[in-house]
């Protein structure tokens, strides 16, 4: 599989997993209810009109604009990946692909519904969804790849 295809497949799989999971939750669990009713891990159907941790709640236009900017940045990174060696690898392109998937997954909800469907609750952490997980895992993955590639290439620019 070519590297470009790796990027697009990881993006498509992330979007599909996100949208399918939200469809299943919406079709089977009334808003505000959870399974189980209490406990450390719950599946709970909530509508989030904000971003992570519900910040910028009610500012859908800003969140849509930020998401569109995120899509543009991810696509730009894909097209200039040859200049970023840590990114022009299968793991780098998978990480970038799931970042794009998370951005697009939540953007679809915001444009279509005016809110994002969240449904995973772990402990006291704010409720989130597959798109949020894609974004988090992708960003952490890219950071780790960058750190490792900097050490492997002998980059000592931080000592200058």
Swiss-Prot record:
Which pathway does the UniProt entry assign to this protein?
Answer: Protein modification; lipoprotein biosynthesis (signal peptide cleavage)
Q: How does it sit in the membrane?
A: Multi-pass membrane protein
- Give the transmembrane ranges: 60-80, 84-104, 128-148
Location in the cell:
Cell membrane
Top-level taxonomic group: Bacteria
Q: Which GO terms describe its cellular component?
A: plasma membrane
Question: Which EC number applies?
Answer: 3.4.23.36
UniProt keyword Lipid metabolism, yes or no: no
Q: Keywords of this protein's UniProt record, alphabetized? A: Aspartyl protease, Cell membrane, Hydrolase, Membrane, Protease, Transmembrane, Transmembrane helix
The UniProt entry, under InterPro entries, shows: Peptidase_A8
Q: Which GO terms describe its molecular function?
A: aspartic-type endopeptidase activity
What processes does the entry annotate via GO biological process terms? Answer: proteolysis
- Catalytic reaction equation(s): Release of signal peptides from bacterial membrane prolipoproteins. Hydrolyzes -Xaa-Yaa-Zaa-|-(S,diacylglyceryl)Cys-, in which Xaa is hydrophobic (preferably Leu), and Yaa (Ala or Ser) and Zaa (Gly or Ala) have small, neutral side chains
Quote the catalytic residue positions. Answer: 118, 132
Keyword flag Protease: yes
Q: Which PANTHER family match?
A: LIPOPROTEIN SIGNAL PEPTIDASE
Q: What does this protein do?
A: This protein specifically catalyzes the removal of signal peptides from prolipoproteins.
Q: Its family?
A: Belongs to the peptidase A8 family.
Full protein name? Lipoprotein signal peptidase
